[in-house]
């Protein structure tokens, strides 16, 4: 605001205080400089405390405006008109006014909440939109809005209106990541306090839940991942009967690899069981075909809440150049907005002992160097993140930062703007995992931390906590950050748009970009592309520079985002190897249909596709055939398991007919053309035919495992052969047997002879550095093995065995307590 002179410009002072009160949650000071101004202030404060007196405010405001006009002071007249406009707008958007109207509930039901400091004094455009669409009245909806427009508060208001109207006593929020579930749980606890029971389920696929939680008289908010919810209903099908409100956050997971199939079948199951009284909300910031999803999921019973006019916090998009400039663009990639000249100063680095070549920083062709340079310069203004396209790149960026320190480069801005105490604590925690000499530990002392999927959960939570509390200013991260984790980032430096070997999806990048300049954290932000080749070669047709530029600029256009597809539909779609080669999806699907009953169906498919590819393109030995076929196998197993669940809870003997109905209820079938629909029906039919060999009791057991029938049968056989319920095994014997069986039935990404030793060290609580000293394997490989192969796959496999074991009266031994404990130890890596 302009400088305020309270003696000559009272309206300006009132306006400043009011905006601080409404937007920044500051105290509202009563202006006693003029009697009429004081009356306006007191009536405003009374209104926001009680919800009463809106008409009186308008009358007092009219009188106050008249008095100011009579004083004939030009600046006071100017500001009193602005003040009147602000107050009238604030009253029209007031929570006291809108929430009772949108929810069709009496104001008294909102009164206690709106009097509390946690309540919003005005509703944001996103919250007004969901109100106007009837979501607060119980209307099911797809909510497609950009990140950072008030989604968390919207979820809270949806839940409050549902509880206040008695439409629901239990709400469940489903989010794709444990980190996101943690964040949502903390937000809900902060918002509701002791009013409701907030229960976050663990992500361990074990029976750590009970229907007894519904006995509590308090309203309940449950939070879990899609896999956990699917696991729960496969064990207790009537669990869903207790839920009145379903909220799916980041609800664009239908085509997320093999997880997508589980997600689609889960939502299809809920969709089929939900009554008109229950409410289903699916939220996503990047659902470009939201209308299509809404027609499938909700039909006439739901609405689409989306408005392109609602924008996220503004962000500037910059491109680095070898000329040391940054060029900024907005909506039109052909029209530059402005540029910042000579923003880089290249500095000579100290030579190491016996080093002759002079080295400089930053190297103007190195995207990572440019990102580090700008991060060091800008982090004093707010949090910065350097995006790395893979975990190995995270390490290389951190190694470069350490090298720069060793060569005498000044990184004081990064370290100086961090909380030294908190960084020391983080460094100590990092040392416990990786050792004192690991680059991650050293980087913590410099104010830099990593963030990626394989980082141990405790460390990742500590890093996110430090970021949220602004204890550090620079994080080097992968695309894991795009999946909904909210930390305060003002500057995002993109070193690459590739993820592994593929270009990042536009919607993934949009989600990543949405982490910057989030409302309530920063009012603006910047995304800077630090690979200078993109800008410098934008007009160059040689080597595809212009094509890469076009692909890059599309990333910033939310309207160009890929439509959300279906993993199940991928079963009948083409396998694309590269721009030259691929396989017709219908032919691949027909092969699977014809050979599905054979044990080696998918191995044979890999062999035939590989032979056909190499016969035509002998050089394409490094291809994605095995990965594509493996994805199809996992998707088929997900369908298989879901049909086991449905058949085990349905007395109808015509399983083919049931399978056909389930197929027709999927998003895949809704999106498919006629030929694809016919193939999908055949796929569901052959799976139903395979399942028809088993009785209800067997199917119930197989459904509980969340895996395919073939592996369930192998587990049954292994349990019987090893007399698990007849012979008492020590824990050591049990671990060895399980690891051996796991290796027989699973394929590791890398053949590792010391896998059993790593498992034992993991169970003993050894750190990565201790494992590295014993095995000589790179720490990055050990991270991958422990977080994926052991913590997820092996612990899940032990859970499968637990689900299949049946304890009878004649059994001598009950191995379940030991197996349950072992499952948790494998999950968390503790003794």
Predicted regions and their residues:
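N-terminal helicase ATP-binding lobe
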Residues: 1-831
């Amino acid at each position: 605001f302009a400088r305020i002179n309270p003696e000559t410009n009272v309206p300006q002072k009132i306006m400043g205080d009011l905006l601080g009160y409404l937007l920044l949650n500051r105290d509202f000071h009563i202006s006693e400089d003029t009697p009429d101004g004081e009356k306006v202030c007191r009536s405003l404060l009374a209104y926001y405390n009680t919800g009463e007196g809106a008409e009186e405010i308008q009358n007092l405001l009219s009188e106050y405006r008249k008095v100011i006009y009579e004083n004939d002071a030009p600046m006071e007249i100017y500001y009193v008109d602005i003040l009147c406009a602000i107050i009238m707008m604030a009253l029209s958007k007031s929570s006291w006014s809108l929430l009772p109207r949108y929810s069709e509930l009496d104001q008294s039901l909102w009164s206690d909440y709106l009097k509390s400091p946690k309540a919003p004094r005005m509703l944001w455009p996103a919250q007004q939109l969901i109100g106007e669409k009837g979501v607060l009245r119980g209307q099911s909806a797809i909510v497609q809005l950009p990140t950072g427009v008030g989604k968390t508060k919207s979820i809270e208001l949806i839940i409050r209106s549902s509880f206040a109207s008695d439409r629901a006593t239990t709400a469940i929020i489903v989010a794709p990541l444990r980190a996101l579930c943690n964040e949502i749980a903390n937000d809900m606890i902060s918002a509701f306090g002791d009013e409701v029971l907030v229960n976050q389920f663990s992500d361990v696929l074990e029976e750590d839940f009970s229907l007894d939680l519904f006995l509590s008289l308090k309203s309940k908010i449950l939070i879990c991942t899609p896999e956990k919810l699917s696991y729960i209903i496969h064990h207790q099908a009537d669990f869903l009967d207790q839920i009145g409100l379903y909220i799916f956050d980041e609800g664009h997971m239908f085509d997320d690899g093999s997880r997508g199939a589980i997600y689609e079948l889960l939502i299809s199951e809920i969709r089929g069981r939900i009554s008109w009284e229950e409410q289903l909300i699916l939220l996503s910031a990047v659902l470009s075909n939201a209308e299509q999803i809404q027609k499938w999921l909700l039909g006439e019973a739901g609405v689409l809440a989306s408005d392109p006019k609602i924008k996220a916090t503004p962000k500037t998009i910059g491109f680095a150049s070898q000329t040391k400039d940054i060029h900024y663009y907005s909506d039109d990639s052909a029209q530059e907005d402005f540029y910042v000249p000579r923003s880089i100063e290249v500095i000579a680095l100290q030579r190491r002992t016996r080093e002759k070549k002079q080295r400089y920083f930053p190297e103007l062709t190195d995207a990572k160097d440019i990102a580090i340079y700008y991060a060091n310069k800008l982090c004093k203004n707010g949090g910065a993140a350097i995006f790395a396209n893979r975990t190995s790149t995270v390490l290389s960026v951190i190694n470069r930062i350490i090298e720069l320190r060793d060569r005498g480069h000044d990184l004081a801005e990064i370290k100086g703007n961090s909380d030294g105490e908190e960084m020391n604590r983080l460094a100590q925690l990092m040392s416990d995992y990786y050792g004192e000499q690991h680059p991650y530990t050293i980087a913590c002392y410099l104010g830099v931390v990593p963030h990626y999927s394989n980082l141990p959960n405790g460390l990742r939570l500590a890093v996110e906590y430090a970021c949220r509390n602004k204890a550090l200013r620079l994080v080097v991260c992968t695309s894991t950050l795009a999946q909904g984790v909210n930390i305060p980032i003002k500057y995002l430096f993109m070193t690459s748009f590739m993820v592994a070997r593929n270009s990042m999806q536009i919607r993934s990048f949009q989600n990543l970009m949405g982490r910057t300049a989030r409302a309530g954290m920063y009012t603006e932000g910047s995304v800077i592309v630090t690979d200078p080749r993109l800008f410098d070669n934008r007009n160059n047709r040689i080597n595809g520079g212009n094509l890469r530029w076009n692909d890059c600029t599309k990333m910033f256009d939310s309207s160009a985002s890929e439509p959300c597809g279906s993993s199940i539909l991928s079963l009948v779609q083409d396998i694309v190897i590269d721009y030259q080669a691929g396989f017709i999806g219908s032919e691949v699907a027909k092969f699977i249909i014809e050979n599905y009953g054979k044990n080696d169906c998918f191995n044979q498919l890999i062999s035939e596709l590989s032979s056909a590819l190499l016969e035509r393109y002998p050089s394409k030995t490094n291809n994605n055939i095995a990965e594509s076929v493996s994805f199809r196998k996992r998707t088929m197993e997900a369908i298989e398991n879901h049909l086991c669940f449905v058949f085990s809870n349905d007395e109808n003997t015509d399983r083919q007919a049931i399978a056909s109905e389930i197929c027709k209820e999927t998003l895949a079938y809704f999106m498919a053309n006629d030929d694809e629909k016919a193939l999908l029906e055949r796929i569901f039919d052959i799976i139903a035919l395979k399942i028809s060999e088993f009785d209800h009791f067997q199917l119930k057991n197989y459904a509980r495992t969340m895996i395919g029938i073939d592996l369930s049968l192998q587990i049954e056989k292994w349990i019987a052969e090893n007399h698990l319920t007849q012979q008492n095994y020590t824990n050591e014997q049990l671990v060895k047997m399980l690891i051996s069986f796991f290796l027989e039935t699973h394929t590791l990404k890398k053949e590792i002879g010391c896998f059993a030793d790593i498992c034992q060290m993991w169970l003993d609580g050894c750190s990565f550095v201790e494992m590295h000293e014993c095995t000589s394997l790179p720490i990055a490989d050990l991270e991958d093995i422990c977080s994926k192969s052991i913590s997820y796959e092996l612990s899940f496999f032990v859970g499968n065995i637990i689900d299949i074991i049946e304890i009878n009266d004649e059994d001598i031994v009950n191995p379940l307590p030991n197996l349950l404990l072992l499952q948790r130890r494998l999950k968390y890596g503790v003794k």
